[in-house]
Amino acid sequence: MFTVFLLVVLATTVVSFTSDRASDGRKDAASGLIALTIKGCCSYPPCFATNSDYCG
């Protein structure tokens, strides 16, 4: 019974680890899209005036 418990814990850990690594790529893509959107906003004066704290 203890062996089954260890196998379940190991399987859960492996699935969780690989799922987290897969989602990291999606997070990177989303942050890149947000950065491009903010850069576009910084070059547009009305948007820059409203969101100047995001523009470097």
From Swiss-Prot:
<feature type="modified residue" description="Cysteine amide">
    <location>
        <position position="55"/>
    </location>
</feature>
<dbReference type="GO" id="GO:0035792">
    <property type="term" value="C:host cell postsynaptic membrane"/>
</dbReference>
<feature type="propeptide">
    <location>
        <begin position="17"/>
        <end position="39"/>
    </location>
</feature>
<dbReference type="GO" id="GO:0099106">
    <property type="term" value="F:ion channel regulator activity"/>
</dbReference>
<comment type="similarity">
    <text>Belongs to the conotoxin A superfamily.</text>
</comment>
<feature type="disulfide bond">
    <location>
        <begin position="42"/>
        <end position="55"/>
    </location>
</feature>
<keyword id="KW-0008">Acetylcholine receptor inhibiting toxin</keyword>
<dbReference type="GO" id="GO:0005576">
    <property type="term" value="C:extracellular region"/>
</dbReference>
<keyword id="KW-0027">Amidation</keyword>
<feature type="region of interest" description="Ser-Xaa-Pro motif, crucial for potent interaction with nAChR">
    <location>
        <begin position="43"/>
        <end position="45"/>
    </location>
</feature>
<dbReference type="Pfam" id="PF07365">
    <property type="entry name" value="Toxin_8"/>
</dbReference>
<keyword id="KW-0964">Secreted</keyword>
<keyword id="KW-0528">Neurotoxin</keyword>
<dbReference type="GO" id="GO:0030550">
    <property type="term" value="F:acetylcholine receptor inhibitor activity"/>
</dbReference>
<feature type="signal peptide">
    <location>
        <begin position="1"/>
        <end position="16"/>
    </location>
</feature>
<keyword id="KW-0629">Postsynaptic neurotoxin</keyword>
<comment type="function">
    <text>Alpha-conotoxins act on postsynaptic membranes, they bind to the nicotinic acetylcholine receptors (nAChR) and thus inhibit them. This toxin blocks mammalian nAChR alpha-3/beta-4 subunits.</text>
</comment>
<keyword id="KW-1015">Disulfide bond</keyword>
<keyword id="KW-0800">Toxin</keyword>
<keyword id="KW-0732">Signal</keyword>
<keyword id="KW-0872">Ion channel impairing toxin</keyword>
<dbReference type="GO" id="GO:0090729">
    <property type="term" value="F:toxin activity"/>
</dbReference>
<dbReference type="InterPro" id="IPR009958">
    <property type="entry name" value="Conotoxin_a-typ"/>
</dbReference>
<protein>
    <recommendedName>
        <fullName>Alpha-conotoxin AuIA</fullName>
    </recommendedName>
</protein>
<dbReference type="InterPro" id="IPR018072">
    <property type="entry name" value="Conotoxin_a-typ_CS"/>
</dbReference>
<feature type="disulfide bond">
    <location>
        <begin position="41"/>
        <end position="47"/>
    </location>
</feature>
